[in-house]
Curated annotation (Swiss-Prot):
Transmembrane segments: none annotated. Coiled coil: none annotated. Belongs to the herpesviridae UL49 family. Interacts with ORF34. Disruption phenotype: Deletion mutant shows mainly attenuated late gene expression and decreased virus production while viral DNA replication remains unaffected. It comes from Human herpesvirus 8 type P (isolate GK18). InterPro entries: UL49. The keyword Zinc does not apply. GO terms for biological process: viral process. Participates in the expression of late viral mRNAs. Induction: Expressed during the early stages of lytic infection. This is Protein ORF66.
Length: 429
């Protein structure tokens, strides 16, 4: 069933409107009609749903001082439309908005609130579109506004709530308990040396078993849910995050912080390749070039960048990970053999070659990555700012060394103008 037909049935069943009147004055048909798919995106994301290419009908709904004027332009291209046609068009536009709200939130309005008199629909014609949507949702006791999702186009480092730490209460998640080790099997009666346990030791052990039948194990379900959600969301093209740090339960806040860190924090900068000799040398070194191991959550490089370097100031780093051990490297678990980041504890890592190719076919280009000492590549704003970074050695095909450079950002962008800048002392001699 087409979406506009589903909306008509929704209006008839919910508000008791005349289906014949709705069919006679359709607003989602014709050359000047509103496309149903675009209208759904408009209701959810507003102007941001069109990514800068907003159609004329959406512009009329937002800019006209009243819904009646917007409908008049949509229906006839002028300011004169019959009153009944205006009311039917308003019922379709506002009713479709309510349908989207009810479908996404699974909310239900009271039966007595659905019987909307004709004069109330006529009143909505004198209001702007956004205010008419808010008034109708308020009448139906639906907690909603237009648009449903507020899109913020500001860069994440400029958001005010990213410049302060979270000092609120820690979320209290229900903890699980499992049977103690002695209740999972037969307890040993001898120690490792083959010596028996005395009567006093046996009594002490039995007393401890009685008072501690279970042991806490945290909440593995929350940990599993958070891990699965994070891995799923980083593969999505669009993700909706909480508007501020204080909203949502602890798991939601943690996911929002991890997603922002995944998309914002990075130590790598792609240097534009200017010289053809540098491009050929980088292509030849793809298999043997130096590599950077980057934690995908805190954004730190774990094999470069330790010591005293010129770093980029990045205040939001304290929001994502407040602790700083001054040591970005690997931590290997002696029990399981898993490798963790010593800074944030994550095991989600990725290896980036410092010489690589991006794109395919005619869009392929050579990329040389420069690795900063911290995770603030996004915060570089000033061309005169001095930074420390690591680049690969391109001297000989067998050399896997990396070079430490101290340059300003302008010099970093012009570094590939000559091959000599990418030769270590051994290769240049």
């Amino acid at each position: 069933m087409a979406l506009d037909q589903r909306w008509d049935r929704f209006l008839v069943s919910w508000f008791g409107l005349d289906e014949a009147q709705l069919t006679a004055h359709r607003v989602f048909e014709g050359e000047n009609g509103v496309p149903v798919e675009e209208y759904v995106a408009f209701v959810i994301f507003g102007e941001r749903g069109f990514q800068g290419n907003m159609p004329s009908w959406a512009r009329h709904l937002l800019d006209r001082p009243s819904l009646a004027q917007a409908i008049a332009v949509l229906r006839a291209g002028s300011d004169t439309v019959a009153k009944q046609a205006q009311i039917c068009a308003a019922q379709q536009l506002l009713g479709a908005h309510v349908w989207v709200v009810v479908t996404l939130s699974r909310a239900q309005a009271a039966d007595h609130a659905r019987a909307i008199p004709r004069h109330v629909w006529a009143k909505y014609l004198s209001l702007p579109f956004s205010k008419a949507c808010a008034q109708l949702c308020k009448l139906l006791a639906l907690c909603s506004r237009f648009p449903l999702v507020t899109c913020c186009s500001k860069p994440p480092p400029s958001l005010p709530w990213l410049r302060k730490k979270w000092h609120g209460p820690l979320p209290r998640r229900p903890l699980l308990e499992v049977p103690s080790p002695t209740r999972r099997g037969v307890a040993a009666t001898e120690d490792g040396n083959g010596l028996g346990i005395g009567a006093a030791d046996t009594g002490l052990r039995e007393a401890l078993e009685r008072v501690a039948p279970t042991v806490p194990c945290g909440n593995p379900f929350d940990a599993m849910l958070g891990s699965l959600c994070f891995l799923s969301l980083i593969k999505s093209r669009h993700v909706v995050l909480p508007a501020c740090e204080q909203e949502g339960p602890g798991l939601v806040r943690n996911l929002g912080r991890r997603l922002l860190a995944y998309n914002v924090l990075s130590p790598c900068v792609s240097i534009p390749v200017i010289c053809s000799r540098v491009a050929r040398a980088a292509l030849a070194k793809r298999a043997r070039c130096a590599r950077a191991v980057v934690c995908m959550e805190c954004g730190h490089c774990l094999n470069f960048g330790r010591g005293k370097f010129h770093t980029v100031n990045f205040p939001p780093t304290n929001v994502f990970f407040s602790r700083d051990r001054k040591e970005k490297q690997f931590t290997i678990c002696a029990t399981t053999g898993r490798i963790y980041c010593s800074y944030c504890g994550s095991e989600h890592m990725r290896v980036y070659p410092l010489c690589d190719i991006t794109g395919r076919g005619t869009l392929a280009r050579v990329v040389i990555r420069a690795v900063l000492a911290n995770n603030a590549a996004l915060a570089i704003r000033d061309l005169d700012q001095t930074v420390s970074f690591v680049v690969p050695c391109l001297g000989t095909p067998d050399c896997e060394a990396a070079l430490l450079k101290h340059r300003d950002v302008r010099g970093l962008l012009q570094l590939t103008s000559q091959l000599l800048e990418f030769c270590c002392g051994k290769c240049s001699s």
